[in-house]
């Protein structure tokens, strides 16, 4: 179970790799199992995005796809088909989490934005 938790689940468990580029190459080469597993993973991501929209009472201005996998046309096209009914989909490929946190801290320190405090459930306190 610990192996599963520590990165041996998901794509690795099903396809022996965590490299999305390799999985997409296998799909392009006709590997139906790779397509089934990858599409299943993306379907789960689309469901999660939809669930977050429901939690926001549908008040969503944009769905923003970030992270390394947002460089993939396959991923972006799949997720856009599934979630664009919620709001326009925007792609900001790459991993910008630390930059976003730093920029937010600067806005608070400069008095441009109020600091937000979240409780242990992630709700704005």
Walk through the language-model features, giving the residues of each:
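Adenine-nucleotide phosphate-binding core of ATP-dependent small-molecule kinases
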Residues: 3, 7-58
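A glycine- and small-aliphatic-rich helix-loop capping segment at beta-alpha/alpha-beta transitions
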Residues: 78-87, 112-114
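Glycine-rich phosphate-binding loops at beta-strand->alpha-helix junctions
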Residues: 60-79
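Short, small-residue-enriched loops and turns at beta-alpha junctions
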Residues: 11-14, 67-71, 98
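Hydrophobic, well-ordered secondary-structure elements that form the walls
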Residues: 45, 63, 105
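Glycine-rich phosphate-binding/hydrolytic loop that grips phosphoryl groups
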Residues: 70, 90-125
